């Protein structure tokens, strides 16, 4: 193991409760056990739904599944590692706080054992693409070691931190849920792609959501770098409240320093790197993502040529305006990661709307779709599904969309979209909603959509 064990204070002879046995909980429990902690894992789902439980039991880790017995938690525990999705209103979390037990998320644990620099990336939208681009650019240079992706992107941070060497860099996608549970976490480089209203059902207010995002920089010093979207006034104001060295990036404006785009080209410190048309992914939002990633790459001395070549050959990540395939002259795109209105608006900006059939819908969080209406104007057809299908249909009517249909789910919308389209059109799944009304997560939603598209080619 390559982790920096001497930094970790909750290991030998210490009792630790891991709450939630998802990917991050499983990895955290294994790491803590290896560090010598007395680990107890608790998950509300029964054993037969948690195959990881058997592996932990074989290691000697205590696992309690199927319920949350409140008497399990007492003052003998020195730490709780909480799954990011579990709210702070959970009885276990509240009891831990009452007992004075620190409550962290797995990314804090990863920081404690990591021997290499961490690049932390957060924001409402663009986190995954920016994280992927950043890792790609860092690995395109001649740097020692490897840039390793971790965090909310799907690779448990504690596992990656264990495996990383001192020459590596960990590029970590961080959600607001994860950032609420940090104490000493300090990235050497941090990126905030943007901040818009989101996850109010979890954070209760926009102020609390922004506060969680801003935790990213709370331990940074002038020796660290904070890369911010200068198009957002809110981030420009927040930049005055950090000790880190601030590096801006912006679209459609000239910056004396930093990454920017202007008149169809991308620049860094006023030196042209590439034309926007040379990017391998479409859309103005992906220009922003590229600028953020370039900002990190230039800090590490990556050449303009390496950046240009890597971004030209990067065609996106799964479920983010992902090209699925073509059938009967129609191109299909999977943007299942678009779990909010802004993400769908950004996706729409990359398409010719009069040749686009949009598939949207999902979990009803009570959001108004009025702000989506301007972006819907000009679309050829709209297919809605899920809990929000009726309200999205109303928004489509207000936008003047000539053809609006409903479907049972995302995959059922595929043959309907085929009927409503013609050769040369694009069909885009960009739900503008979370997936949990019909699917376990946005990845499964996207996979079901892609399976339905692939069936078309088999049946032809």
From Swiss-Prot:
Gene Ontology biological-process annotations: cell division; cell wall organization; peptidoglycan biosynthetic process; regulation of cell shape
Origin: domain of life: Bacteria
Binding residue positions for ATP: 123-129
Listed Gene3D superfamilies: Mur ligase, C-terminal domain, Mur-like, catalytic domain, NAD(P)-binding Rossmann-like Domain
Gene Ontology CC annotations of this record: cytoplasm
Compartments, record wording: Cytoplasm
Class in the EC hierarchy, top level: ligase
UniProt main location, coarse: cytoplasm
Pathway given in the UniProt record: Cell wall biogenesis; peptidoglycan biosynthesis
EC number of this enzyme: 6.3.2.9
Annotated catalysed reactions: UDP-N-acetyl-alpha-D-muramoyl-L-alanine + D-glutamate + ATP = UDP-N-acetyl-alpha-D-muramoyl-L-alanyl-D-glutamate + ADP + phosphate + H(+)
MF term (GO), any: UDP-N-acetylmuramoylalanine-D-glutamate ligase activity
Keywords: ATP-binding, Cell cycle, Cell division, Cell shape, Cell wall biogenesis/degradation, Cytoplasm, Ligase, Nucleotide-binding, Peptidoglycan synthesis
Family: Belongs to the MurCDEF family.
Physiological role: Cell wall formation. Catalyzes the addition of glutamate to the nucleotide precursor UDP-N-acetylmuramoyl-L-alanine (UMA).
HAMAP family (UniProt xref): MurD
Protein name: UDP-N-acetylmuramoylalanine--D-glutamate ligase
Organism the protein comes from: Enterococcus hirae
Gene for this chain: murD
């Amino acid at each position: 193991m390559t982790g920096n064990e001497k930094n970790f204070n909750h290991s030998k002879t210490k009792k630790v409760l891991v709450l939630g046995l998802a990917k991050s909980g499983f990895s955290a429990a294994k790491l803590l056990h290896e560090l010598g902690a007395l680990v107890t894992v608790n998950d509300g789902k029964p054993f037969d739904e948690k195959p990881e439980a058997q592996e932990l039991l074989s290691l000697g880790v205590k696992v309690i599944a199927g319920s949350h017995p409140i008497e399990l938690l007492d003052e003998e525990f020195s730490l709780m590692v909480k799954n990011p999705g579990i709210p702070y209103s959970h009885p276990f979390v509240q009891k831990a706080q009452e007992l004075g037990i620190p409550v962290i998320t797995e990314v804090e644990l990863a920081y404690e054992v990591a021997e290499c620099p961490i690049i932390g990336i957060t924001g409402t939208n663009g986190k995954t693409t920016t994280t992927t681009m950043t890792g790609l650019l860092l690995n395109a240079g001649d740097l020692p070691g490897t840039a390793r992706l971790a965090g909310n992107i799907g690779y448990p941070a504690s596992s990656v931190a264990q495996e990383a060497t001192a020459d590596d860099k960990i590029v970590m996608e961080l959600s607001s849920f994860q950032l609420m549970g940090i104490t000493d976490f300090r990235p050497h480089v941090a990126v905030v792609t943007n901040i818009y209203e989101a996850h109010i059902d979890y954070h209760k207010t926009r102020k609390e959501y922004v506060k969680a995002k801003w935790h990213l920089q709370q331990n940074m010093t002038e020796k660290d770098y904070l890369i911010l979207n200068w198009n957002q006034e809110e981030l420009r104001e927040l930049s005055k409240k950090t000790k880190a060295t601030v590096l801006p990036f912006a679209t459609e404006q000239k910056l004396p320093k930093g990454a920017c785009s202007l008149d169809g080209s991308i620049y860094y410190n006023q030196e042209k790197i590439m034309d926007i048309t040379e990017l391998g992914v479409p859309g103005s939002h992906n220009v922003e993502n590229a600028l953020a990633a370039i900002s990190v790459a230039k800090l590490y001395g990556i050449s303009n040529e390496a950046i240009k070549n890597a971004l030209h050959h990067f065609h996106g990540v799964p479920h983010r305006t992902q090209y699925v395939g073509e059938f009967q002259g129609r191109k299909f795109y999977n943007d299942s990661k678009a779990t909010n209105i802004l993400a769908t608006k950004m996706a729409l900006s990359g398409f010719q709307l009069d040749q686009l059939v949009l598939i949207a819908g999902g979990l009803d969080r009570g959001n108004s779709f009025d702000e989506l209406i301007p972006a819907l104007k000009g679309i050829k057809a709209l297919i809605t599904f899920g809990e929000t299908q009726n309200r999205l249909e109303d928004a489509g009517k207000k936008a003047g969309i000539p053809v609006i249909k409903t479907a049972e789910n995302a995959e059922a919308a595929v043959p309907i979209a085929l009927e409503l389209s013609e050769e040369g059109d694009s069909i885009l799944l960009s739900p503008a909603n979370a997936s949990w009304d019909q699917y376990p997560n946005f990845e499964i939603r996207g996979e079901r959509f892609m399976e339905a598209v692939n069936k078309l080619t088999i049946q032809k």
